[in-house]
Design a protein with these regions (language model features):
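Bacterial N-terminal signal peptides
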Residues: 5-15
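Boundary at the C-terminal end of the N-terminal hydrophobic targeting segment
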Residues: 16-22
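Amphipathic, alpha-helical segments enriched in basic
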Residues: 19, 58-61, 93, 133
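Sequence context surrounding c-type heme c attachment/ligation sites in exported
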Residues: 25-28, 35-43, 47, 51-52, ...
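Alpha-carbonic anhydrase
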Residues: 30-32, 37, 48-51, 56-57, ...
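N-terminal post-signal-peptidase region of extra-cytosolic proteins
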Residues: 61-79, 101-104
Length: 199
């Protein structure tokens, strides 16, 4: 007799559980994040050139920083303005090359990946807001895995203090920025910073 009430209770509770994204993060047995081999085919959020968070630095070489996000996460973001559990953002660093092929001016990306970090939302593994950063020692090696960067590393404090949405730098990704504006999901920190900058 208890079977039907139990099934009804499950029917009510199960939709409340966040669904795992099919393209979400995967891990090794010891908790490292696996290299997301398909990320070049993910949603491209944006690229910065020679970005720095301090004004008094002069790079000795130019660098492109491109960000990709798994399609499942971006689909949810477009409807809600927030990143769901299972979000994987890949920051890919490539050097900039000058004249090559028919290019005589400006810069293009080099073929070698020089650096990679991953920003992941996984509430099952990470306490608090669920977000964690992972770094790769061999960024171009598809068989490699990334270790979680421990708090209180500067990447955490910087993102928490300045990120536009959910500790992510949506302010640098034009299409995602439009979504955040439409959904009014900017963080209080970002709004406060922008208000102060406008004065």
């Amino acid at each position: 007799m208890l079977r039907w009430p139990l099934l009804l209770l499950l029917a009510v509770l199960l939709p409340m559980q966040p669904a795992a994204l099919p393209d979400g993060p995967t891990y090794t047995a010891d908790g490292q994040i696996k290299y997301p081999t398909g990320y070049p085919e993910w949603v491209f959020l944006g690229t910065g050139l020679d970005m720095s968070y301090t004004a008094d630095t002069t790079p000795d070489h130019s660098m492109f920083n491109s960000v990709f996000v798994n399609p499942g996460a971006y689909k949810v973001f477009k409807t809600s303005g927030h990143w769901p559990d299972g979000t994987v953002m890949v920051l890919e660093n490539r050097g900039a090359t000058g004249a090559s092929s028919i290019n005589k001016r400006g810069k293009t990306e080099s073929s070698d990946v020089m650096g990679m970090e991953i920003h992941v939302k996984d509430s099952a593994r990470v306490k608090g807001d669920g977000w964690a950063f992972y770094g790769f020692e061999r960024p171009g090696d598809r068989n490699s895995s990334g270790r979680m960067i421990a708090r209180p590393a500067s990447c955490y404090t910087c993102h928490e203090a300045h990120a536009a949405v959910d500790t992510t730098f949506v302010q640098f990704y034009p299409n995602a920025l439009d979504v955040a504006k439409e959904k009014s999901t900017f963080s209080p920190e970002f709004l406060k910073e922008n208000t102060a900058a406008a004065k």
